[in-house]
């Protein structure tokens, strides 16, 4: 009897191991908030769910953001900013209080799975490397008290500059000046089965060495390969070469088994005059090819088939970030919700992307294209469903005072995102109250259901059947809906109108069915064997 139970037990263990082995690499998104006029966290959560993104990185533990992701199933990586490292490292009580206030009230409804302690501390001007490990240990102690030390992983993200050399990959090594910091931190990661977090940016390597690095090599578009003379390994793209450099550096320090997670990678869509490769076309090409590579062809030349999790940087352009122009233009979306370029996050679209090698950087403008994700669409600008299309605009007969009063209400209590009519935004010109009010009135009208009563504004507005959009200023239009679609009131922004229900997207349904078939095909023989045993 005991032998039979043991046999059944090990059969099921083997099955679970097999199913776990088949798990795919993961694509996540970085949700930075160093910008003005971003959509509310609730609206951002809606957008991320629609895009079917299951993994999100934030850079603090903002309560409003944590609440917005509650009960979504999205796995959240939260951050401890560099400015908080001293307090976290000095006193356990500080960390205990932080955990009690910022984590425990929202967990597990908000699925927090990891904490990144500090951001690229080796490159920070205040040199806070000595604070990272004490802070990590205090966080681990606090999590252990709450029984969460096995459920929430702790690590710290680094830039590639932590290496003293990165090419050829086999000769890569960590900088000696960081060895005193790295070795005990890596021991902590091994002890707690946490990943080594690295931010990889082939863009910077290309920008700083355009005469040596082909753009195609940085964009996953190269038809030739670079050889590592020591190993003979061939590299067709820079991302793999950078990632293998990390693997080799870890091996050189006797930490070969540490899992690596890429916590940032992306490409800017706009840059300074000298950053000619910072274009929307190249950003789309890099991120599209990165997703396809990670999902469809996992691993690197040194570690073929190795599962690797990658977080794309970033969801939004962040206009408050200091530095050169490209620093503020890594996002897939503008702050007003229009897409900088339409990225397929699934990796299933095989349409070729066309990078550009322009001699002058181009300035991306808000797109009027739908954002396609599988078979679901977010309609941008003057799209919409069937039936008579109507818009609500400001009446030319209304006084400036009446228009301004109604505009202030729409952008305030009316909950309209009016960032599109701010300076340097697509609907700022013409800079008149009549024009700005028209945009705000229509956004409120469409978000509220596009009924005549929603276009009253005390007589300061009128309904029209001609699309008032002009240039890059796109007016929302609410599409016709049926039992399978839903119109969002208080949507992502004035330019995102409606989304198919993300509750059962075709891609997720197909994947669930595929996994079920695999499970049944493996379990069924087991049941036959088990029946014969009994």
Curated annotation (Swiss-Prot):
Topology with respect to the bilayer: Lipid-anchor; GPI-anchor
Ribonucleoprotein found in the keyword field: no
Catalytic function, reaction form: Hydrolysis of (1->3)-beta-D-glucosidic linkages in (1->3)-beta-D-glucans
Signal peptide positions on this chain: 1-24
Region (Disordered): 348-379
SS bond partners: 392-455
Enzyme active site: 120 (proton donor), 264 (nucleophile)
Gene Ontology CC, one term: side of membrane
Mod. after translation: Contains two additional disulfide bonds.
Glycan attachment positions: 127, 336, 357, 375, 485, 491, 495
Keyword annotations from UniProtKB, A to Z: Cell membrane, Cell wall, Cell wall biogenesis/degradation, Disulfide bond, Glycoprotein, Glycosidase, GPI-anchor, Hydrolase, Lipoprotein, Membrane, Plant defense, Secreted, Signal
Lipidation sites (GPI-anchor amidated serine): 507
Subcellular location as annotated: Secreted, Cell wall; Cell membrane
Record-level GO BP terms: carbohydrate metabolic process; cell wall organization; defense response
Superkingdom classification of source: Eukaryota
Biased composition (Low complexity): 349-377
InterPro entries: Glyco_hydro_17, Glyco_hydro_17_plant, Glycoside_hydrolase_SF, X8
The family this protein is said to belong to: Belongs to the glycosyl hydrolase 17 family.
Protein name (Swiss-Prot/TrEMBL): Glucan endo-1,3-beta-glucosidase 12
Species of provenance: Arabidopsis thaliana
Classification of source organism: Eukaryota, Viridiplantae, Streptophyta, Embryophyta, Tracheophyta
